[in-house]
Amino acid sequence: METSPTTCRTLEQYYHVNSKTLDKQYKDVLSDYRTWTELDHADEWLVFPDNIGRNLAIDETSMSNGELRTIVTNRDRHGKDQCLVAVVKGVKSEDVINALNHIPEALLSMVEEVTLDLSDSMRKIVRTCFPKATRVTDRFHIQKLACDAVQEMRIKHRWNAIQEANDDMENAKLEGREYVPFRYENGDTRKELLARSRYLLFKSGEKWTQSQRKRAEILFREYPDLKTAYGLSHSLRMILSKHTIKDAARLSMAKWYNKVEEAGFRSFNVIAATFYEHYDDILNFYTNRSSNAAAESFNAKIKAFRASLRGIVDEKFFLYRLAKIYAYPH
């Protein structure tokens, strides 16, 4: 239990002990939780200066009741022991900066690269606390914005299709005739076509199944704007997945901006404006092709541990266990 996310409930099955009793005894007697030096402020902030490295990741996660915490991890530790650098309550940049200032300045200055999402508060934290570090915006957050823009257009068309179907049913009822919806050659009605096209719009065309390929053909024929939007999203995916140098990526991104301007879609114009604000951070991805996958993976580990506990009753004790598993050496 000191070095792995094992629960007392799991041990109960193998050692025939009462899990509630073991949990209480571990908390009060077997562990050093009651004498833990970080206990007083654990629910506000935890920092582990010895775990800092040259490559960090910063992200936010929800631990209980939807309350967010900012997590800083050492990417070079790959989610193992001593990977946890800091856990701070909330996402307010001032609070996180104050917590990270407990780490000696010499250690903060040795950080060379920090991966983060598109959050302005995270950007401010990195700029203030790690002055010599290169900021790298996660490519998957960038791609997600484009995918969300395509899905937003699809959903808008779907609502219109649902309303159109409702109107047709009402008219058929008033005229005393049976309502027979129009169906495309693959058997989908208009609203079914738009509902069932959700997942294919997330994928590259070469990964479509035969039925998805047929559905996409009909969808793009009926809704040319979706075809254009999907093309913009796909071309951005190709730019980000291509192994190239920063200057070549800059040129490709500029051409993508021109396509967005020509398309005239509001959502993509907003994305382009967002990219412009984070332009250098996005292009820094091409230096080492670093992503925030380490932070996302660590978030998944926290959520899996929380799920195995069936929720968090004592947040301080949960943070103590996280620290024992991921912050201290084994």
Which positions does each model-derived feature cover?
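A structural signal for short, well-ordered beta-strand segments and their strand-loop junctions
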Residues: 57, 115, 135-137
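RNase H-like nuclease fold core
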Residues: 24-113, 120-125
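Short, surface-exposed amphipathic charged segments that create phosphate/polyanion-binding patches used
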Residues: 147-159
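Inter-helix linker motif
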Residues: 132-148
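Acidic/histidine-rich catalytic cores and adjacent linkers
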Residues: 31, 65-67, 75-81, 97-98, ...
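Short, basic interhelical loop/turn and adjoining N-cap
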Residues: 10-27
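Short, polar/flexible loop-turn hinges at active-site or ligand-entry regions and domain interfaces
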Residues: 133-134, 157-161
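Short, amphipathic alpha-helical "recognition" segments used to contact nucleic acids or chromatin
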Residues: 1-6, 241
